[in-house]
């Protein structure tokens, strides 16, 4: 019987050590993720100050940041409103279809960049298709090309 009690004591020490290691690990994780210590309103305020690129990078930091950023639709709305200046019809159509602000931004961000370049006349004097930069092209519908043609005719 005496041997069993020694063995149980050894198990208890190991169990206590394991709890200590777990507690230390949780403490380190909490220190590394100070956002979890802040009130949700403060965290949201900080994230709302980020530009699109920084917001996307922050969402890659950890699961809790990703969840917060991904599920806070109001973080994405101001960025959508900026894109809407160039892609009004597309944004309005997506809103009517019930997409979230985040999805609307994902669907239209790159298109808005390319469309803005076309509308601003960046490609007005292209001599051949070879002159077009391939990496910034984006498929656009007939209505968008119509807007671009109208802008070209007004120049």
Swiss-Prot record:
PROSITE patterns: FBOX (PS50181). Residues 32-79 form the F-box domain. Residues 7-19 have a biased composition (Polar residues). GO terms for cellular component: cytoplasm; SCF ubiquitin ligase complex. GO terms for biological process: SCF-dependent proteasomal ubiquitin-dependent protein catabolic process. Residues 1-27 are annotated as: Disordered. It comes from the Eukaryota. This is F-box only protein 48. The lineage of its organism: Eukaryota, Metazoa, Chordata, Craniata, Vertebrata. The gene is FBXO48.
């Amino acid at each position: 019987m005496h041997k069993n009690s020694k063995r149980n004591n050894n198990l208890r020490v190991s169990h206590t050590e394991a709890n200590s290691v777990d507690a230390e690990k949780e403490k380190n994780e909490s220190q590394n993720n100070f956002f979890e210590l802040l009130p949700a309103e403060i965290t949201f305020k900080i994230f709302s100050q980020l530009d699109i690129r920084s917001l996307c990078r922050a969402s890659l930091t950890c699961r809790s940041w990703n969840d917060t950023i991904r599920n806070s639709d109001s973080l994405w709305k101001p960025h959508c409103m900026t894109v809407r200046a160039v892609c009004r019809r597309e944004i309005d159509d997506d809103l009517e279809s019930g997409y979230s602000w985040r999805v609307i931004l994902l669907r239209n961000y790159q298109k808005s960049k390319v469309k803005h370049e076309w509308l601003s006349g960046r490609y007005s004097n292209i001599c051949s298709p070879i002159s077009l930069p391939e990496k910034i092209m984006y498929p656009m519908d007939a209505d968008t090309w119509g807007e671009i043609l109208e802008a070209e005719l007004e120049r």
